[in-house]
Amino acid sequence: MFQKRPWITLLAFTALGFALTQGILFSRWGMNVGLLAAAGVLLWRAWGGGPRRRGAWWWLLPAACYGAAMALWEQPMLSPLLLLGMVMALGLWALDGIHAGGPWEQVRPFFPFGEMEAVASGLRRSARAGRLGRVAMGVGLAVPLLIVAGGLLLSADQAFYDFFEGLTNSLADTLTEVVAKAVLSLLIGVYLCCFYLQAEREKTPALRPQREGDPVVLGVMLGLYCGLYLLFLVISCRVLPEMLRPGGAPELYSGYARQGFFQLCAAAVLNLAVFLGVRRQRCAGRGFTRGAQTLLAALTLCLIALALTKMLLYIRLYGLTLLRLYTSCMMVALAVLFLALMVSLYRPLPMLRLGAVLAACTLAVVGLMNAGSLVAQTNVDRYLAGDLQEMDLTQYTDFPDAAAPALCRLLAQTEDPALREEVLTLFEDALSTREHLSWWSDSLQRRQSAALMTQAVEAAGE
């Protein structure tokens, strides 16, 4: 299709890119529908457009869980980036050749930029074949020249500037938004053309052979690397008894918890790169090198456990938030990933498939746990029991519907007039902004919480 009608194909994919940007970036329901559509396309490729994958329909389960979570509950912090991770995981399962080669060979179909030259040559050939295409090419070449020359002329003469001032002021904001969306949609369209052309040609990337690594070099490198982790863990664990002692040094572990997660992410990514790099060497399975990799995985698990301990201590002191809850879930997922890496050193495991399963299941669990309600219920229970000194209500402005049942219980049981006033103000603000919400941001939880908040505000007014 692209060889016969390249411009029509590009325009169609650009329109699809515009629909995707509008739906995914500005609509929760658009995100949901986009995810399910991507899952359907990738599964169709697995079942109809390529070799039949055994058990491929299981990927509909996490997609359905995520869709149900978005329809039932508020999801204030689940961004389109997580959706992209889910779609990538689905694609890794569905694409042909998933079991062959290293990680880069397996994800290479998602980066079809080698087809960029073929797409550009096809567009040029089609444009030169017709008069309308040549006119469009001339307009496209003239646009950047007009922009540059126009800017220079506007600065050179005040009368010329005054002539266009009213037009530019009225169209500046509109053109900025339209141009930004058009450029983004066009880039997505070009990417989809490259992806389509690659699939149409059914290219299979050549697999790179393993390198002949030096076991001494790898052993020394991994030994020094593990020594750094050992030193870090020894120094960090020296203050662990003080942190675990009731009422001891809260400022110490609060500082640890603020920095621990980001340090953990950087260390985990670095360790993952080390694992993938070492496993590309033929000597990776030999005794000393394999033992050093095992030690590195074990030290990484200890680091994750230490960081998770700090986070739990921080939650015990300052309460639970969505970010702290999601951080804890990511720590657990990282621990499972590195445990699988350790096992794969002694027993062959499909690590890419396991990673995709782990990512999809983590997103499904996070979506179905009703995180906002869990955070509010936990904090209210601890505050009413006297385990939490202060009740911070500012975070609930992001998810008032999820927190409404717990806050109604707090409103009925607390005797603090200032806290009651804060809860009522939160409810009134949520009810006032509800009128401006569009239909695609609706959920079952939002409908149920409206009655609770209205009843609480009316009861307080009486």
Q: Can you say where each PLM-predicted feature lies in the sequence?
A:
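Alpha-helical transmembrane segments and their cytosolic membrane-interface
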Residues: 1-44, 294-306, 310
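Juxtamembrane membrane-water interface segments of multi-pass membrane proteins
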Residues: 1-7, 47-56, 119-135, 162-163, ...
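Hydrophobic alpha-helical transmembrane segments in integral membrane proteins
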Residues: 365-390
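Internal/C-terminal transmembrane anchor helices
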Residues: 226, 349-372
